[in-house]
């Protein structure tokens, strides 16, 4: 119509009437656009549900939107729905008339109807499925338990869309359930203590990503973090005053329960014992030979060694004495006090990285091994582990430990936590296969060590179900799921969120969604939206980057630092803290490497631009590549200026200079104007592969190589 009017087909119509026809056409087109159906691929759902069907129409939100709950849910559903409403009004700015939901069937004609048939029990094997049906005038959420309903509410929040003037949910049907029953995150609160608010906001994030286990690593060489009423030396001598009171722990457990999260505490024994033995050295294995004088004796007559809280990272000798009855007396008392704080069915006893050096050097322990026909330290550790099992069982707890606990004599009730891989000289996931074949339930963490700064794709494509392992259906059923692990040797409360999120959301999808949901680029697209939305839960993973950069810039303009961080990544694996001694637990973690993360944004974009240019050397594609080089040249200039009044910028200049030099020459290469020999050009690019500056590396190196 618009086309015909302009061609003169309606030339005999009055001008005013023709204007009206054009106006009606614009309105008609706008209406068609506003009503255009969203495509499934445009949704930013994570984890991706098992089944999604998009239908015609939308449910438009107004202030009259209300929620009603029916069935027999756990009371946690009321808090969950209230939080849902607050997050929804926070996103939309709509002043909903409904404030707090406190009882069943309060608003029978509400637009959102939630029905739960039973009260969900926190733990494994609960039905977490849900069914969400959105029409143009009603939303129905059905779930067997309130845990499933909470998951459904998270999906509903992610379904929220907007036009220029309103917010709506696309009409759809979603049926969903988790693939694995154990979908966890471990946070190490020993090496760097993590305050209560850090723990709570990350529990909120776990719930948002439909994860259901929080593994709380509370005791290691670097500190004891649980208030003890009986054995008070733990907090007096081994905590640096940084610990959770029992009331704080109870409060966090309640907080997690309200969000459907199981908490699994960990006290790491018999190795990683520096903090424990700082408090109670009499149960240590180390032998001290006295040259004179007298010394207090432990009950076996061995001089008591002096231990201290460990300030470095790594594997250390202090180990509990498995031959000493007092070891079990103290641990039994600890479990009697700690187990009631955690109502869940599982207790993690660590059991990893015990090299047995102090055991080998202690004659009494060697005598104990012979007496009990224990041929190896591994068998001795199994003996130790099996003494703990009844202590935990008394409190209704199942024992769980890192994969080193696995021996032929281990009780089949124990859960084996698989963690070692190529970094430890092992085949990835081999212990998981060994465990399930021997009849043990197991959880995978190898491949989910997010503290090691590996690319997100490496975690996302790491499936707990091993390929080609030839497992029976029964053996596969013993693979409970997986757990992301956040060790905190190089992580403080300021940086922990930036290391956890949004990458943990990709792991959450691997543990929840169907096995064939493996499109990395699609995941990245959705993750960008998910990351933004996680901020509403109080996570600091986006804003704290700028906090660190402002400190580095000495409160000057941080734009150049931001741009440089977009091509820089922290050194990966264990290379940032070689030998565990470059940093101590009290070192500053406010450096440039702490502001950087894996999957540097501009590195990803530059790689795409280079690939497009190499496939089609058009002027447009060449300009896109050149724009990056121009930017990096300017960044080096700005960093140089910035460093005049910002000493913390100085360590970056050698690296930014190398990128600057490569960029200048590659601009000439793009124009066929470079006069450098091929070997010299290659050497210039190789300079960008250095790992010698500021504990970061340039993540554009591989893409730069493609251009020569």
Which residue ranges define each predicted feature?
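Bacterial Sec-dependent N-terminal signal peptides
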Residues: 1-41
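Contiguous, structured surface segment used for ligand recognition
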Residues: 37-180, 513-514, 518-520, 525-537
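Substrate-binding groove of N-acetylhexosamine-processing glycoside hydrolases
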Residues: 45-48, 53-55, 260, 318, ...
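Flexible loop/turn segments at secondary-structure boundaries
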Residues: 75-77, 193-195, 221-225, 270-276, ...
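A structural preference for short, hydrophobic beta-strand core positions in alpha/beta folds
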Residues: 98-100, 265, 401
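Beta-rich nucleic-acid/ligand-interaction surfaces
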Residues: 102-108, 222-231, 406-412
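Feature activates predominantly on carbohydrate-active enzymes
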Residues: 119-346, 362, 387, 391, ...
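N-terminal leader/propeptide and maturation segments of large enzyme subunits in energy/redox metabolism
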Residues: 350-374
């Amino acid at each position: 119509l618009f086309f015909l009017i302009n061609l003169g087909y309606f030339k005999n119509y009055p001008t005013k009437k023709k204007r009206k026809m054009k106006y009606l056409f614009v309105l008609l087109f706008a209406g068609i656009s506003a009503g255009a159906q969203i495509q499934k691929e445009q949704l930013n759902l994570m984890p991706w549900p098992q089944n999604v069907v998009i239908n015609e129409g939308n449910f438009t939100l107004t202030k009259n939107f209300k929620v009603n709950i029916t069935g027999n849910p756990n009371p946690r559903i009321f808090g969950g729905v209230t939080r849902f409403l607050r997050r929804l009004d926070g996103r939309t700015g709509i002043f909903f008339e409904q404030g707090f939901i406190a009882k069943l069937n309060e608003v029978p004609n509400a637009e959102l109807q939630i029905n739960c048939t039973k009260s969900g029990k926190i733990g494994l094997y609960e039905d977490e499925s849900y069914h969400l049906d959105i029409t143009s005038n009603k939303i129905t959420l059905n779930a067997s338990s309130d845990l499933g309903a909470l998951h459904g509410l998270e999906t509903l929040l992610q379904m929220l869309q907007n036009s220029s003037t309103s917010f709506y949910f696309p009409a759809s049907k979603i049926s969903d359930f988790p693939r694995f029953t154990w979908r966890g995150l471990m946070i190490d609160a020993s090496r760097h203590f993590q305050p209560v608010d850090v723990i709570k906001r990350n529990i909120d994030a776990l719930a948002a990503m439909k994860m259901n286990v929080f593994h709380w690593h509370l005791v290691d060489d670097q500190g004891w973090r649980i208030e003890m009423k009986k054995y008070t030396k733990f907090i007096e001598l081994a905590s640096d005053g940084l610990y959770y009171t029992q009331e704080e722990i109870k409060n966090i457990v309640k907080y997690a329960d309200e969000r459907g999260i199981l908490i699994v505490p960990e006290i790491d024994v018999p190795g990683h014992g520096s903090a424990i033995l700082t408090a109670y050295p009499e149960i240590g294995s180390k032998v001290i030979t006295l040259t004179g004088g007298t010394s207090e004796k432990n009950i076996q007559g061995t001089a008591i060694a002096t231990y201290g809280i460990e300030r470095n990272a790594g594997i250390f000798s202090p180990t509990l004495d498995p031959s000493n009855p007092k070891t079990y007396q103290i641990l039994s008392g600890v479990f009697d006090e700690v187990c009631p704080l955690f109502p869940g069915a599982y207790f993690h006893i660590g059991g990893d990285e015990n090299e047995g050096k102090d055991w080998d050097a202690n004659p009494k322990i060697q005598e104990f091994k012979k007496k009990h026909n224990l041929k190896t330290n591994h068998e001795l550790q199994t003996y130790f582990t099996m003494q703990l099992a009844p202590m935990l069982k008394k409190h209704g707890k199942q024992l769980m430990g890192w994969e080193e606990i696995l021996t032929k004599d281990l009780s089949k009730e124990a859960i084996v936590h698989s963690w070692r891989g190529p970094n430890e000289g092992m085949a990835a996931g081999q212990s998981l296969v060994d465990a399930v074949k021997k009849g043990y339930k197991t959880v995978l963490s190898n491949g989910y060590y997010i503290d090691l700064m590996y690319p997100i794709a490496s975690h996302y494509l790491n499936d707990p179900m091993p390929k080609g392992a030839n497992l029976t259906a029964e053996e596969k059923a013993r693979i409970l799921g997986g757990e992301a692990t956040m060790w905190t040797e190089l992580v403080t409360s300021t940086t922990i969120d930036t290391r956890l999120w949004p990458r943990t959301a990709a792991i959450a999808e691997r543990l929840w969604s169907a096995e064939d949901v493996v499109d990395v680029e699609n995941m990245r697209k959705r993750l960008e939206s998910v990351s933004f939305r996680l901020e509403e839960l109080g996570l600091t993973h986006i804003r704290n980057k700028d906090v660190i950069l402002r400190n580095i810039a000495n409160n000057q303009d941080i734009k150049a630092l931001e741009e440089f961080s977009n091509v820089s990544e922290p050194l990966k694996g264990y290379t940032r803290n070689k030998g565990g001694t470059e940093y101590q637990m009290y070192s500053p973690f406010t450096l440039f490497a702490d502001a950087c993360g894996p999957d540097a944004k501009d590195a990803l974009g530059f790689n795409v631009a280079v690939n497009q240019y190499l496939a089609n050397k058009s002027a447009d594609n060449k300009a896109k590549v050149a724009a990056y080089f121009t930017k990096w040249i300017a960044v080096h200039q700005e960093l140089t200026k910035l460093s005049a009044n910002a000493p913390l910028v100085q360590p970056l200049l050698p690296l930014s200079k190398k990128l600057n030099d490569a960029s200048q020459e590659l601009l000439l290469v793009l124009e066929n104007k470079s006069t450098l020999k091929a070997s010299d050009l290659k050497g210039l690019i190789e300079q960008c592969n250095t790992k010698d500056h500021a504990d970061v590396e340039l993540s554009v190196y591989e893409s730069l190589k493609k251009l020569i």
